[in-house]
């Protein structure tokens, strides 16, 4: 916790420890960080015998009072995840796509208003991410892009993230502080907003957004529904936070790497223009543009939106990772940022090279930004849709560069680990093509 409080860069601290001490590093009284690709399948993929660690129990261990993400019992998680998968299915995404497109168009209009002048794309990517999730999550618009300002409820979320970065290594302390009157005042603005909007959504049982799928399941007595009133309130909060900050960070980071690597950006533009020779008016989502996906995958390799390892607990009998025995009841994790930048597993590991993915598979490489197995992020396809839409539209319309000589360094050095990445301003200048 001392290191976390100093610089809020736990992902870099963990990487440094592995460079110094090797593949297996003790990072807590009974906690190990394991920097090996072979550990990924053992820890995260079926038929793993690990379970989620106590870190996930910061709210409660009672499954009727927690979100899907806090659920530690595999059978319960597997059941509850089914309704989320309905709300995030390809069929559902087809319904959401025009609404996401509308937010992309609004984002592009704001970029147009700043043409030739610096614009903080960290801020506008955040506006975009939360506006999208407000719409497809609740059919509610935060109007952040329109007003070019942060909604008060969302500001409360971001004011609370610093505590997670510092205290998240001691989950019981974070839980204790959250119960001190006034200590969680900022976050309470967000919880109040979610509760109010959830009550409004109960009047609408037509699944036009993600939360209505959960409410429909609850009203119909579906076993996959959130198991109680508190559980669905927690799911509502999870929906907005998990679906917004992660995608926003990925979009900002992709723009950072493309501005830093003009040749990669030009290749992306050429790949998109080849599919849409008539420009933006020809654009459709159904075109397969491999290099666009390579850019996204490479961005998530170098700067995963959740950079730390996702902790699991070994079964009582322990388990083997290669030739190493890990005792039972030990918290273990593969450090995402570290394993995705290890030179043993990646050539020119710290370089942005989207073309490396021409001969690589996301499932066979040590690439885990969405994690693996039953606990994997159910929103992966939604995130990819948002990123493909936003990046392809920007590439079709604009060239871009950093606003000043130090903009790149300021952005790269200012990243903080608050479970998800908290990013500094990214000042870019866009020029119409």
Q: How would you name each of these model-derived features?
A:
Residues 418-433:
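C-terminal helix/juxtamembrane-tail motif
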Residues 334-360:
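Conserved cytochrome P450 K-helix/beta-meander segment immediately N-terminal to the heme-binding cysteine loop
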Residues 52-61, 95-251:
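Cytochrome P450 heme-thiolate monooxygenase catalytic core
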Residues 246-259, 390:
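Short, small-residue alpha-helix embedded
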Residues 1-79, 94, 99-110, 128, ...:
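N-terminal membrane-proximal hinge/A-helix region immediately C-terminal to the signal-anchor transmembrane segment
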Residues 3-15, 196, 279-322:
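Conserved cytochrome P450 K-helix E-x-x-R motif and the immediately C-terminal K′/meander segment
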Residues 268, 299, 329, 352, ...:
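Hydrophobic, well-ordered secondary-structure elements that form the walls
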Residues 262-264, 363, 375, 380-418:
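Cytochrome P450 heme-binding "Cys pocket" and the immediately downstream C-terminal segment
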